[in-house]
């Protein structure tokens, strides 16, 4: 899996980059059909200085996206990964259901 890491409006330290890439590797262990992933961290200058994590995952023609805003980058990354995990579960269930319906239709025709 190819992972692209981008930081906007700030310069990340190496620990943050490694943490984000390690989190993406956990998703890859769950589903090996991930082709590419992009992690974008940004900093919104507001009263509370919001940290935003955007994670895009490409899975065989489908793009999954999760965006989280919290007060820390680690929390934002974790929350976005949890969202993507749920999306991957739904995607895998959808693929599994499609294969079952195809078998059922063939049996009904016979």
Annotated model-derived regions:
Residues 1-110:
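N-terminal, polar/charged subdomain of small-to-medium soluble alpha/beta proteins
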């Amino acid at each position: 899996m190819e992972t692209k890491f981008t930081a906007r409006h700030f310069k990340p330290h190496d620990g943050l980059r490694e943490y984000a890439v390690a989190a993406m590797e956990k998703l890859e262990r769950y589903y090996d059909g991930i082709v590419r992933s992009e992690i974008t961290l940004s900093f919104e200058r507001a009263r509370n200085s919001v940290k935003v994590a955007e994670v895009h995952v490409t899975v065989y023609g489908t793009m999954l996206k999760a965006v989280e805003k919290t007060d820390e980058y680690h929390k934002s990354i974790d929350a976005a990964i949890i969202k993507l995990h749920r999306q991957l579960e739904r995607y895998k269930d959808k693929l599994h259901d499609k294969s079952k319906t195809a078998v059922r239709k063939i049996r009904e025709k016979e």
